[in-house]
Amino acid sequence: MLSNTLRSNFLKFYANRHHTIVSSSPVFPHNDPSILFTNAGMNQFKDIFLNKETVSYSRATTSQKCIRAGGKHNDLDNVGHTSRHLTFFEMLGNFSFGDYFKEQAIAFAWEVSLSVFNFDPDRIYATVHEKDDEAFALWEQHLPSERIFRLTDKDNFWSMAETGPCGYCSELLFDRGESFGTATSPLEDSEGERFLEYWNLVFMEFNRSAEGSLLALPNKHVDTGAGLERLVSIISGTNTVFEADVLRLLISKTETLSGEKYHADEPLGAAFRVIADHVRSLSFAIVDGLIPGNTERGYVLRKILRRSVNYGKRLGFTQPFLAEIVPALVDAMGEAYPELRLSVSQIQEVMTIEEENYFKSLHRGGNLLQQVLKSSSSSSTISGEDAFKLKDTYGLPLDEIALLAKDYNFSVDLDTFYQLEKEAKERSRKNVIKSHNATDTVYDALSLGENSTFVGYHDLSCDTFIEAIIKNGEQVSYLKEKEKGILILKETPFYAEKGGQVGDSGEIFCSDGTFIVSHTTSPKAGMVIHHGEVSQGQLHSAQAVTAQVHCLRRKNISNNHTGCHLLHKALEMTLGDHIRQAGSFVDDTKIRLDFTHPKAIAPEDLASIELLVNEKIRENHRVETREAAYSDVMNSKEIKQFFGDKYSDVVRVVSAGFSHELCGGTHADFTGDLGYFRILKEHAVATGIRRIEAVTGKEAEVLARQDNQDLNEIALILQSPRDQILNKLQNILDEKKEQTKLISDLENKLIYSLLDKVIDRCQQIEDVSYFIYHLPESESHRLQQYANCLHQKIPVRLVSLWTTQKNGKYIIFSRISDDLVKQGLKAKDLLQVLLTPCGGRWGGKDIFAQGSADSLPQADILNNTLCQWISTQLI
């Protein structure tokens, strides 16, 4: 694969020039709710640019996995219809954090263009900002001035946000030749097909104030990004990014599965392109811990998958197919991203389940669309509200709604539809940035000399100083008795909630007062904030205090965290290597672990997992921790790491017997400290994600005692020895089964007895025999039984039965034979006709349906309505 070679050579080039190769962060930022997905190489370095985070290196290079399918950068609707738009792509980049600047960045870019990309220097062009004389002069060392163009802020000025770091940028373009257009310069190439941009160099040298003025940054940074797929296309000489390398391989696989051939210029070409791109986005998102859902990132992922299915239908796919393309992706990219190989079954399972659900939803949506068409017959227009519901709730594409509407000479109220869609997108955007705005402001404004130093791995108490006090979102100088607030300390033994471990509680005190810490969090890297209330006296900023963690609670939390690690390893050993942690929570009372697994765990496997964890507890292994360079452990098969997580260059390895994980949490000293481990329950939390809840120590002992007590009480109730309880229960169930059958037989005899009395009420219209009858109130729970018996006894082809409940409401049931359904008669349509005039409700399937109403017309009116409906349907 050319992409593998190009990626490797690019990273090696910069590594040989003192750049640290930094692994790609996940496709969604864990600690930045302001953006839906990682959409550029600089995202994972954002806090470095903002001086919120420090790292040991000043130069970095990456190949970053990116998704642009939501928020400000959203290419979803363009994918498949242009030559280069993608939702998933890789961005090659090099970064300088206060190290080199324009001169070196431009020199590197030129050298890479010639020696790594092997571009003809006579076909390279550059753009700079109209005010950036320095960059223009530097490019003149490599290019003639007539191939360097000055552009405005619109094209050559970059900013992270409305305020903050920003600067001029310089773009590199490659002339693909006259076959891609007649333009003679980038300025004439409005479509950008001949002179294709392949690299953007951003020079962060300013800080934009709230007033809009540009101030010089004390440290100047470089951020560059080059799209790997675009580079591969240029080097391969293909017309589009889809005709080379990985994407072409995925298109070929789709050709094999569909039996159709890919032709770029034909209408079906878009379907191939959409599927190839979307399979990559879905696969990497699932690997990094995302699953399709109804909100935020999960909702976007669901849209991507459903869009794939919609285009797949054009190629003839009528059942799940995306999972069959995944192995081709793994073959192409598994070497560069080994997490793909480890998660193949998980990716395929999530895709297949989601596709199955969507195909069912499409079927329901199609039926609903038919109802909408009937209910809208007076206006010949499908309302924007109905169209939006069909798309948003049932996933029916707008173009499919419009096509079906056209078949019936209907139109769609597109203005209202697009307005509702716009409002939905705006709500989604506000939800994404809401938590970001609410949590960052006050902490970003603090001027602290140093971040809080955590000493709590070994010390649960320390003498320290109060560095800041926050009350009601504002920094204050003191807190009085009974006032709630937040303390920030210079050193702290309190562990802040993160990595699934709950924060510590305890006390912060001095001779002047005591602050009860209820919980501890970390709003940004390096900062620990203590939430609580002054119980007596008062506390001031800069005051010397003693910080004391609640020791027993910490011990129980630490034991449970170690238990979580043991459980994770036991799951992997029992169920397989596909097990990956998808989330966790540990406090002083319980363990909750979410993990990837396609189905419920068998009881015998749960028992094996529990036994294995308890075996490691009895072996009483020392729990050991050590720090290591991430580069030394990142490829270790023994040490568990989570592909959705971002790691610093120095990591902490926690080893507990057979378990080895990268973890920053607190742990037991020995596995034996856990005492005993019990699983409470196992259940699904999302498609392909299971959850186990468990307890250790005292909580596990309490559970065991309760189980023992329950068994004794059950034995007493059953009047059976404990070792005979199961046999006794089985005998009771067998007896109940026999009694139920006897009751059912008697009920059927009663039903047939009643039917013998009313059999002469069966009526006929043409060749359709039908039966409509009012049953006594006592028979309301057996409407369906009566209808089925009528079909068997006469057999009658259409039945409608109704009765009155004790609350005065009417219940009506209709059943239609299979052969009538094939002729177009549907039970739910009949109930719609019978119940609409009286404001009733109904639901069901084509063969049988049930409804209710507060009132019904007289029997003869119902009979006439039914006759008219049958006659109309048979025309």
Curated annotation (Swiss-Prot):
Domain comment in the entry: Consists of three domains; the N-terminal catalytic domain, the editing domain and the C-terminal C-Ala domain. The editing domain removes incorrectly charged amino acids, while the C-Ala domain, along with tRNA(Ala), serves as a bridge to cooperatively bring together the editing and aminoacylation centers thus stimulating deacylation of misacylated tRNAs.
A single GO cellular-component term on record: cytosol
Function: Catalyzes the attachment of alanine to tRNA(Ala) in a two-step reaction: alanine is first activated by ATP to form Ala-AMP and then transferred to the acceptor end of tRNA(Ala). Also edits incorrectly charged Ser-tRNA(Ala) and Gly-tRNA(Ala) via its editing domain.
Cofactor: Zn(2+)
Keyword Transcription attributed: no
Residue positions binding Zn(2+): 561, 565, 663, 667
Main location: cytoplasm
Gene Ontology molecular-function annotations: alanine-tRNA ligase activity; aminoacyl-tRNA deacylase activity; ATP binding; tRNA binding; zinc ion binding
Name assigned to this protein: Alanine--tRNA ligase
Catalytic reaction annotation: tRNA(Ala) + L-alanine + ATP = L-alanyl-tRNA(Ala) + AMP + diphosphate
Xref: SUPFAM superfamilies: Class II aaRS and biotin synthetases, Putative anticodon-binding domain of alanyl-tRNA synthetase (AlaRS), ThrRS/AlaRS common domain, Translation proteins
Family stated for the protein in its record: Belongs to the class-II aminoacyl-tRNA synthetase family.
EC number: 6.1.1.7
Alphabetic keyword roster: Aminoacyl-tRNA synthetase, ATP-binding, Cytoplasm, Ligase, Metal-binding, Nucleotide-binding, Protein biosynthesis, RNA-binding, tRNA-binding, Zinc
Origin species: Chlamydia abortus (strain DSM 27085 / S26/3)
InterPro entries (UniProt xref): aa-tRNA-synth_II/BPL/LPL, Ala-tRNA-lgiase_IIc, Ala-tRNA-ligase_IIc_anticod-bd, Ala-tRNA-synth_IIc_core, Ala-tRNA-synth_IIc_N, Ala-tRNA_ligase, Ala_tRNA_ligase_euk/bac, DHHA1_dom
